[in-house]
Amino acid sequence: MKLTKVFRTSQFKRDAKALFKKHYDPSKLAHAVAALMAQDRDELQTRYRDHALQGQWKGYREIHLEGDWLLIYRVQRSELLLILTRTGSHDYLF
C-alpha cells in the first residue's frame, strides 16, 4: 500500500537545513523519501539498509542515505502517513 502524505517534524526541518548548508545533496533525500512513499521494500533493504530501531526509538525505523547520513522515520498506516523525524550522522543523532 502506497503512502499518500508526508509530515516533516520541526526538528527534521532544522536537521535538513543544517545538512544542506554543509552541502549534503538534497536529491539523495528526495529519492529516499520517494522509495519510502512507494514502500519499495527491495530498494529500502538493499540500497538504504532499512531497519527498526530499539530503546527510546522503538517504533521508528532508520535508513542510511549514504555513509554516515541517516534518516529516522515512522509510518502511520491508519492515515497512510510518512513521518520524517530526524536526519544527520550517528554521532549527531545518538
Describe the predicted segments one by one.
Residues 1-67, 76-82, 87, 91-94:
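Basic, Lys/Arg-enriched alpha-helical interface segments
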